[in-house]
From Swiss-Prot:
Tissue and organ distribution: Expressed in leaf blades and leaf sheaths. Expressed in shoots and roots of young seedlings.
Assembly behavior: Interacts with BZIP46.
PANTHER family the UniProt entry points to: SERINE/THREONINE KINASE (PTHR24343), SERINE_THREONINE-PROTEIN KINASE SRK2A-RELATED (PTHR24343:SF376)
Role, per record: May play a role in signal transduction of hyperosmotic response. Can phosphorylate ABI5 in vitro. Can phosphorylate BZIP46 in vitro.
Name under which the protein is recorded: Serine/threonine-protein kinase SAPK6
Activation and inhibition: Activated by hyperosmotic stress.
Catalytic reaction(s) noted: L-seryl-[protein] + ATP = O-phospho-L-seryl-[protein] + ADP + H(+); L-threonyl-[protein] + ATP = O-phospho-L-threonyl-[protein] + ADP + H(+)
Organism: Oryza sativa subsp. japonica (Rice)
Cited SMART domains: S_TKc
E.C. code: 2.7.11.1
GO molecular function: ATP binding; protein serine kinase activity; protein serine/threonine kinase activity
PROSITE patterns cross-referenced by the UniProt entry: PROTEIN_KINASE_ATP, PROTEIN_KINASE_DOM, PROTEIN_KINASE_ST
Residue ranges, annotated region (Disordered): 298-365
Length: 365
């Protein structure tokens, strides 16, 4: 860890803490996500790292390496100085149609590349889209903790993601197409940018997950009268918010949609993007670590630290997190563990989903 020096903490969540670090030699700023050694280092962590490592696209946060400390596994990534798109929305209230399109175009290009690489993200949302520090911000998709590769993993069937962004078929507990669920989440992201609110939440009762679920499965949303957007934009949203994923617009169709094509930056055109889609297995990733090297480090990280004594600069121990009022197992109630191999813990949202199933409130497809 002599390679990096600590600058400041930049976030915390279910995984632990994230810190802004600087490479002592190159002076490059990086973000480091610290995960406590031991039980938290599971198949999901390995999946996140391996999936993320395989991706090389300007609209995806670059994975650099993993580092083992005495107390934590640290994932080293590109630092996005512009912060979360969520914070930008909170500051602005909502975006104009043109600004919303600018970010949506980048989001779709990043997701399209993920899908080409046979990886579905499964937790796309404003909080998982970062911005670089440039005057015309470049959007960067991050957090592949729920991602699945169709080449490496089974077809998803568990209810994961964030309630406001979740697609109807994900609630069914049956197998579903993760790529089409990503399309739905992209639509929710677009709606929030345009309106400044979530499409399927009751504004008077936003924490009522049961009501949100009901609105999702019945496609109950509307665009407020005070939001003036084009007919093309409305039509695109209506093609995304379709309950049957087989009838939902695809990423390919979105990229050819008139609203999406308008004012499309040159670097996002299909001709410019083609270089990222070359099937060249010898192409370098952003990481110098091989998969075998990474898996060896991850395996070693499964061994808990010998003691809970904090080590300066190596992240917080769980005791420190709890003293600061941060329960490492809490992440604002927006995460649900994978069933079976990924745990049996339930949050309030999961309970609401199960209650809805039990009372036949969910429409089975």
């Amino acid at each position: 860890m002599e390679k990096y020096e600590l600058l400041k903490d930049i976030g915390s969540g279910n995984f632990g803490v994230a810190r802004l670090m600087r490479n002592r030699e190159t002076k490059e700023l990086v973000a480091m996500k610290y995960i406590p050694r031991g039980l938290k280092i599971d198949e999901n962590v390995a999946r996140e790292i391996i999936n993320h490592r395989s991706l090389r696209h300007p609209n995806i946060i670059r994975f650099k390496e993993v580092v083992l400390t005495p107390t934590h596994l640290a994932i080293v990534m590109e630092y996005a100085a512009g912060g979360e798109l969520f914070d930008r929305i909170c500051s602005a209230g909502r975006f104009s149609e043109d600004e919303s399109r600018y970010f949506f175009q980048q989001l779709i290009c990043g997701v399209s590349y993920c899908h080409f690489m046979q990886i579905c993200h499964r937790d796309l949302k404003l909080e998982n889209t970062l911005l670089d520090g440039s005057p015309a911000p470049r959007l960067k998709i991050c957090d592949f903790g729920y991602s699945k590769s169709s080449l490496l993993h089974s077809k998803p069937k568990s209810t994961v993601g964030t309630p406001a962004y979740i697609a109807p078929e994900v609630l069914s507990r049956r197998e579903y197409d993760g790529k089409m669920a990503d399309v739905w989440s992209c639509g929710v992201t677009l709606y929030v940018m345009l309106v400044g609110a979530y499409p399927f939440e009751d504004p008077d009762d936003p924490k009522n997950f049961r009501k949100t679920i009901g609105r999702i499965v019945s496609i109950q949303y509307k665009i407020p009268e005070y939001v003036h957007i084009s007919q093309d934009c409305r039509q695109l949203l209506s093609r995304i918010f379709v309950a049957n994923p087989a009838k939902r617009i695809t990423i390919r169709e979105i990229r050819n949609h008139p609203w999406f094509m308008k004012n499309l930056p040159r670097e996002l055109t299909e001709a410019a993007q083609a270089k990222y889609y070359k099937k060249d297995n010898s192409a370098r990733t952003f990481s110098d670590q091989t998969v075998d090297e990474i898996m060896k480090i991850v395996q070693e990280a499964k061994t808990p630290p010998p003691s809970s004594t904090p080590v300066a600069g190596f992240g917080w121990t769980e005791e420190e997190e709890q003293e600061d009022g941060k329960n490492p197992d809490d992440d604002e109630g927006d995460r649900d563990e994978e069933e079976g191999e990924e745990g049996d813990s339930e949050d309030e949202y999961t309970k609401q989903v199960k209650q809805a199933h039990a009372s036949c409130d969910l429409q089975k497809s």
